[in-house]
């Protein structure tokens, strides 16, 4: 499987993009030529090439997530019902991410 050449749309397939992995995909995209070579059109047009690229990118992200699934935090409940500071927080929204205190830069004057 050859690496996709982004200036030649006919070389872009989901499998080729997926085979690069996320690191290789970022490097290949950054090193891509800006000039489009119209003598190598994609069979489904430019939109088809874009669709294949996005499918390959999604598959590469999925592979990355599966590979590192054991290296991430366990999912947490969305609402912190048993939190010690529950009484300080409003009874709606994402309590786990809501800070009960307003943090301000001490150098900034407060507004009246």
Swiss-Prot record:
It comes from Human herpesvirus 2 (strain HG52) (HHV-2). It comes from the Viruses. GO terms for biological process: viral process. The gene is SCP. Keywords: Capsid protein, Host nucleus, Virion. Pfam families: Herpes_UL35 (PF04496). Coiled coil: none annotated. One of its GO terms (cellular component) is host cell nucleus. Interacts with the major capsid protein/MCP. This is Small capsomere-interacting protein. Belongs to the herpesviridae small capsomere-interacting protein family. Its main location: virion. Signal peptide: none annotated. Participates in the assembly of the infectious particles by decorating the outer surface of the capsid shell and thus forming a layer between the capsid and the tegument. Complexes composed of the major capsid protein and small capsomere-interacting protein/SCP assemble together in the host cytoplasm and are translocated to the nucleus, where they accumulate and participate in capsid assembly. It is found in: Virion; Host nucleus. The keyword Transit peptide does not apply.
């Amino acid at each position: 499987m050859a690496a996709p050449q982004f200036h030649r749309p006919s070389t872009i397939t989901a499998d080729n993009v997926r085979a690069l992995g996320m690191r290789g995909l970022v490097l290949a995209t950054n090193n891509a030529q800006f000039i489009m070579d119209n003598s190598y059109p994609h069979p489904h047009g430019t939109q088809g090439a874009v669709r294949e690229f996005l499918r390959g990118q999604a598959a590469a992200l999925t592979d990355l997530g599966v590979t590192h699934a054991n290296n991430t935090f366990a999912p947490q409940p969305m609402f912190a019902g048993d939190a010690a500071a529950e009484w300080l927080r409003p009874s709606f929204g994402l309590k786990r991410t809501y800070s009960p205190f307003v943090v301000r830069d001490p150098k900034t004057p407060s507004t009246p």
